[in-house]
Amino acid sequence: MQKSLITKWLFISCIMVIAMIVIGGITRLTGSGLSIVEWRPVTGILPPFSFESWQAEFAKYKAFPEYNSINYGMTLSQFKFIYLLEFVHRLLGRITALIYIVPLIYFYFKDVIKNRDILPYIIALLLFCVQGFMGWYMVKSGLLNSPSVSHFRLAFHLIIAVIIYHILFYQLIKNRCDILLIPSQTDLKLPLIFSGIAITVIYVQIFLGAMVAGLDAGLIYNSFPLMGDNFIPMEIKDNFFNLANLHDPVFIQFIHRLGGYSVFLVVVVLVICLLKIEHPKLNKIAYFLMIALLMQISTGIITLLYSVPIIIASIHQLFAIILLSIIIWCYFIIKTS
C-alpha cells in the first residue's frame, strides 16, 4: 500500500514536471516569457480580473525593452494572450512544487520514506527551490537592455527541470520495476556504458537545444543536411574555436546538429548492444528506443525545415524527454540485473 502511494505520487510529479517543460517551451516559442515583469511567488497566484488591473499590467510591460523593440503597438487582447501563457507556466510551477513537497513531508514524517532513502528526494526539493529563482533570474535578463533573455540562463533553467525529472523518474522506476533476471554469464558492461554515454549526450543536446531557442537559431539556415551550400557554414569555418561563437546563432545551430548526429550514433550502438543480449525485456526497450529516436530526429528536422512551427517544436522537445526516460529505464534495468 505504501509503495503504491509513493509510486502514484512520483508518477504524478513526473507528469507535472514534463508538463512544465513543454509549457515552458511553448511560452518561449510564442514570445510570452517576458510578459510578466515582476516576481511575486505568493501574491502572484491570481491573474488580473478587472479591466483596470489588465491596463495596469500592460502599462508595466510597456516600460520594458520587449514592448518598445518588438511588440510596439500591441493591443490589450494580444497582451492578454502572452500574459496568460506565462501566468499558466508560473502557476503550474507552483502547483508542481506543492504536489511534490506536501506529500514528501507527509511520507517522511509517517516513515514511509526512510532516512536511508531520503537523499534524492531532498536534492529534488532543493532543485525545485533553485528552479524558481532560476526562472526569475532568466526573465530578469530580458528586462534590462536587451528584449530577449540570456540563452545561457534559459538553458540552465531547462536543464534544472530535466535533472529534477531525472531524479523523480529514477525513484519511480526504482519503486515500480522488478529486478530483471539475466543469466550471470551475460556481459552487460557495454550496454551499461553506452546507456550512460547516451544519457550524457542527450543532456548536452537538450542544453544546446535551449540555447538554439534562446538565440532564435532555428530561424536561420532552414535546410538539411547542409547549412546553405556547406556542411560547416562559412560564417564560422575560419573562426571555429572562438568563445564569442557561444553567442552566435549560426555556431549554436551547427553544434546542435552535431549533437543530433552524436545522439543518433550512440543510441543506435546501444540498441545493437541490447538486441545482442536476446532478452525479451531488453529487446522491447531497444524497439522503444528506436521509435523514440526516429521521432526525435524527424521532428527536429521538420522543426528546422519549416522555421520552428510551435506544435512540432514542442513535440520535438517532448520526445527528448521520452528518449531520455527510456534510456534511464534501460540504465536502471541493466545496473540492477
UniProtKB/Swiss-Prot annotation:
Catalysed transformations (reactions): Fe(II)-heme o + 2 A + H2O = Fe(II)-heme a + 2 AH2
Spans through the membrane: 6-26, 93-113, 118-138, 154-174, 192-212, 258-278, 285-305, 308-328
One cellular-component annotation, GO: plasma membrane
Superkingdom of source: Bacteria
Signal peptide, first to last residue: none
Gene Ontology biological-process annotations: heme A biosynthetic process
Major localization listed first in the record, in broad terms: membrane
Protein keywords: Cell membrane, Heme biosynthesis, Iron, Membrane, Metal-binding, Oxidoreductase, Transmembrane, Transmembrane helix
One Pfam family here: COX15-CtaA
GO MF term list: metal ion binding; oxidoreductase activity, acting on NAD(P)H, heme protein as acceptor
Cofactor: heme b
Binding annotation for heme: H256, H316
Subunit text: Interacts with CtaB.
Biological role: Catalyzes the conversion of heme O to heme A by two successive hydroxylations of the methyl group at C8. The first hydroxylation forms heme I, the second hydroxylation results in an unstable dihydroxymethyl group, which spontaneously dehydrates, resulting in the formyl group of heme A.
Name of the protein this chain belongs to: Heme A synthase
Source organism (scientific name): Rickettsia felis (strain ATCC VR-1525 / URRWXCal2)
Gene: ctaA
